């Protein structure tokens, strides 16, 4: 009997997330069949890689949150890294990010830029206290 298609098969998700919220959201997408590409910084990647190290320095948390994903290292502080990200986003369906509010805008990657690049892109922004309001800059 053929395996039924997963509900998110055919969707491309780009994850700009660290620790829990962003990686958890994209992991669910991956489990439901989406292609997920996790973008990590060159300064050690997602800190989750180092949480509760087990055998040979690996992290159970990392293995749980990173499964079924591809991973790519990009330095978004450099134009070349931002250009590669833009190429990935040009045909992506979903962007999941959990930076503090304003980080993507400071990098020149705010919603206005990304929407002009790919009008059908869905952007999921996860932060501890939302994107606006008096507590927006508080860590989550």
Model-predicted regions and their roles:
Residues 1-140:
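N-terminal helix-loop segment corresponding to the beta1-alpha1 unit
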């Amino acid at each position: 009997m053929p395996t039924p298609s997963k509900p998110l098969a055919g969707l491309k998700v780009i994850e700009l997330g660290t620790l829990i919220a962003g990686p958890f959201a994209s992991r669910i997408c991956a489990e439901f069949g989406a292609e997920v590409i996790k973008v990590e910084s060159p300064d050690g990647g997602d800190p989750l890689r180092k949480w509760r190290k087990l055998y040979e320095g690996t992290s159970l948390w990392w293995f749980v949150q990173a499964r079924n994903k591809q991973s790519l290292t990009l330095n978004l502080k450099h134009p070349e890294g931002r250009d590669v990200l833009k190429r990935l986003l040009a045909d992506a369906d979903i962007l999941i990010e959990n930076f503090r509010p304003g980080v993507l805008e400071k990098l020149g990657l705010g919603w206005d830029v990304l929407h002009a690049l790919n009008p059908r892109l869905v952007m999921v922004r996860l932060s501890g206290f939302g994107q606006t309001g008096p507590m927006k800059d508080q860590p989550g």
